[in-house]
A protein has these predicted regions:
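Short basic/glycine-enriched coil/helix segment immediately N-terminal to the Walker B
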Residues: 70-79
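Long, charged, glycine-rich C-terminal linkers/tails
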Residues: 24-43, 48, 78-81
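Conserved ABC ATPase signature
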Residues: 2-10, 38-65, 85-91
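Conserved ATPase-coupling elements of RecA-like P-loop NTPase cores
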Residues: 73, 88-95
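C-terminal lobe/lid and adjacent interdomain/linker elements of RecA-like ASCE P-loop ATPase modules
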Residues: 92-133
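ABC transporter NBD signature
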Residues: 19, 53-55, 73
Length: 133
């Protein structure tokens, strides 16, 4: 295939991997048709993104952004800056993403007005440094 197809396939594959990891395997694959309509494969059925909760949509967008960053930066590690992006996440979703970010061993800056992120980092025993501005 052409370069666009190759990049698209790699992006879809990595997005699917990340989404599967942060959802505990609940969503195994991100699918996209020619009209760029997205759906996910649960392993049992295909679900259109219109039928997913806002929290799950946010997980898909997170996985897509992380996959795009990896694709464009190649083997170079890149810092991740997240500015109040977890508002629609419940505690389980947020804990899964925080653990995934820790596992990736890259610099992560989380800007938030909530204490929940710190509480969940503490609960999961993920080391961090807090800075109050």
């Amino acid at each position: 295939g052409n370069i666009t197809d190759q990049v698209g396939d790699r992006l879809k594959h990595r997005t699917s991997q990340i989404l599967s990891e942060i959802t505990g395997g609940r969503y195994q694959e991100v699918l996209m048709d020619e009209a760029l309509h997205m759906s996910v494969n649960t392993g049992e059925r295909i679900v259109s993104i219109e039928r997913l909760s806002r929290g799950t949509l946010e997980q898909i967008y997170f996985a897509l952004r992380m996959a795009a960053g990896e694709l464009f930066c190649g083997k170079d590690t890149f810092p991740v800056i997240l500015d109040d992006v977890f508002g629609m996440y419940d505690e389980d979703r947020l804990t899964a993403v925080l653990k995934w970010l820790c596992k990736e061993e890259r610099q992560v800056i989380i800007s938030t007005c909530h204490k929940r992120e710190m509480e969940l980092l503490d609960k999961a025993e993920i080391p961090y440094r807090k800075i109050f501005l």
